Amino acid sequence: MKKEGIEGTERFLSPGKGRGLKAIKHFKVGDLVFACPAYAYVLTVNERGGRCECCFTRKEGLSKCGKCKQAYYCNVECQRGDWPMHKLECSAMCAYGENWCPSETVRLVARIILKQKHQTERTPSERVLTLRELEAHLDKLDNEKNEMNDTDIAALHHFYSRHLDFPDNAALTELIAQVNCNGFTIEDEELSHLGSALFPDVALMNHSCSPNVIVTYKGTVAEVRAVQEINPEEEIFNSYIDLLYPTEDRIERLKDSYFFNCDCKECTSKSKDEAKMEIRQKLSIPPEEEEIKQMVIYARNVIEEFRRAKHYKTPSELLEICELSMEKMGAIFAETNVYMLHMMYQAMGVCLYMQDWDGAMKYGEKIIHPYSVHYPPYSLNVASMYLKLGRLYLGLEKRTQGVKALKKALAIMDIAHGKDHPYIDEIKKEMEEQT
C-alpha cells in the first residue's frame, strides 16, 4: 500500500512538539475525523469466552478453538481470520497449561513481530505514520523501565521461541519501548479493559489536556471523533491520560510515561485546579498550606498503595482501605476533591465486584456531578459513570432514574461513539425493555 494520507487531515511539523496531525477542512462536533484498523491487537485473557478473539464482538454461544479450548470465536470466518496470530499461542498454551502467562504487552509484541515478517508494504493502519517511525525514547528510560523491558524480552523468548524468529535484543528493546509509549488500551462502553493494540496513525496525534478529538473503538478499529469545532489548519489533539487530576499530577504522569512537558492551555492556565482540589467548607479553623500539602502526599501514596493492593488483598480489605482513606482525607478535602473521587470510584468498583448494588449506587451518586464538572465535555469517563448508574438503578427497580441516567450517557455517546455504534443500539434496547 502506498502512502495515501487521511482525507481532511495532514501530517505536519507542530511547533515545539515535532510531528503531528492537523485539519485541512472543518470538522464539527461529533464528526468522524478518521478511523484506523489495528496494526496488531490482542484480547485480554479475562475476556476469553465472552468475546470473539478476532473481532471483539460480545455475544453468547461463541465457539471455542478445538485444540487449546481457550480462544473463542463468532464463527469459522473469525477463527480463520485469527489463526495466523492464534497459532503463535495455541500449541504453547496446550504445552504450558497453567504456566502459560506472558503479559499482554509481550503477547502484543509477539504479534507485531509476526506481522512485520509477512508485511513488507504499508498497512491501512499506517497512512500517515509507519510503525517504524514510532517514538521509543530509549535514551530516557530509567533503570526500572529497562529492567521491565529485559523481563519482557526474556518472556518473549520463553513463550514464543518455537514459533518466532526474533530480531536481536537491541531491536526488541526498541520495539517494546515503542509499544509501551504508543500502545492503546481498547475499552468497552463502561471503560472495562478489553485488550491492547497498536494504531500508528492514531499515535501521530499530539496530546492536550483540552483535546479536540476523542478515540473510541468499534471492535478492533479505532475511531477518532471531534469533540470541539476544528477549523482548517488547527492541530488535532487527543488526550493520552485520565484528565480528572490537577495540573501537577497530569504533568508528572505525562513526563513519566511519554517523556514530555505539557504546555497546553489547561496546564498553563490551571483553570480547573481550584475546583479539583476543593477544601471542605465551614471548617472552624481552615487548614494551613502545609497541612493541605501533606494530605496531597498522603492521597497520592494511598492511590498507589491501593493500585498494588488490588493484586493480593480481598475485596473487603480493599473496601476498608477506601473507607479509611476517605475518612482521613475528608477531614480536609471536600467530597468533590479529585482524590476523594478517586477513592470513591475504587470503592464503587469493589462494591460492583462484591455485588453490593446499593453500595455501588451510593458511591456513583456522589461521583457523577463532580465528574461532569471536572472532565471536559463529551468525556467517556462521565458517559461510563452515567451508564453504570443507569444500569444499577434499573437492576434496583428504580426505573425512572435508570432511564434518565442512560439518556444522559447516550447524549455523550452519540458524539463520542457516533450514532451508529453497536453500544448505542444495546443501550436503546435496554431502555425499550423498560417501557
Curated annotation (Swiss-Prot):
GO terms for biological process: caudal fin development; heart contraction; heart development; negative regulation of cell population proliferation; negative regulation of transcription by RNA polymerase II; peptidyl-lysine dimethylation; peptidyl-lysine monomethylation; regulation of DNA damage response, signal transduction by p53 class mediator. Keywords: Chromatin regulator, Cytoplasm, Metal-binding, Methyltransferase, Nucleus, S-adenosyl-L-methionine, Transcription, Transcription regulation, Transferase, Zinc, Zinc-finger. Zn(2+) 1 binds at C52, C55, C74, C78. It is an enzyme of class 2 (transferase). Pfam families: SET, zf-MYND. It catalyses: L-lysyl(4)-[histone H3] + 3 S-adenosyl-L-methionine = N(6),N(6),N(6)-trimethyl-L-lysyl(4)-[histone H3] + 3 S-adenosyl-L-homocysteine + 3 H(+); L-lysyl-[protein] + S-adenosyl-L-methionine = N(6)-methyl-L-lysyl-[protein] + S-adenosyl-L-homocysteine + H(+). Zn(2+) 2 binds at C65, C68, H86, C90. Residues 7-241 form the SET domain. Coiled coil: none annotated. A zinc finger (MYND-type) spans 52-90. One of its GO terms (molecular function) is histone H3K4 trimethyltransferase activity. Its main location: cytoplasm. One of its GO terms (cellular component) is cytoplasm. SMART domains: SET. InterPro entries: H3K4_H4K5_MeTrfase, SET_dom, SET_dom_sf, TPR-like_helical_dom_sf, Znf_MYND. S-adenosyl-L-methionine binds at K17, G18, R19, H137, N206, H207, Y258, F259, F260. Its EC number is 2.1.1.-, 2.1.1.354. It is found in: Cytoplasm, Cytosol; Nucleus. Protein-lysine N-methyltransferase that methylates both histones and non-histone proteins, including p53/TP53 and RB1. Specifically trimethylates histone H3 'Lys-4' (H3K4me3) in vivo. The activity requires interaction with HSP90alpha. Shows even higher methyltransferase activity on p53/TP53. Monomethylates 'Lys-370' of p53/TP53, leading to decreased DNA-binding activity and subsequent transcriptional regulation activity of p53/TP53. Monomethylates RB1 at 'Lys-860'. Belongs to the class V-like SAM-binding methyltransferase superfamily. This is N-lysine methyltransferase SMYD2-A.
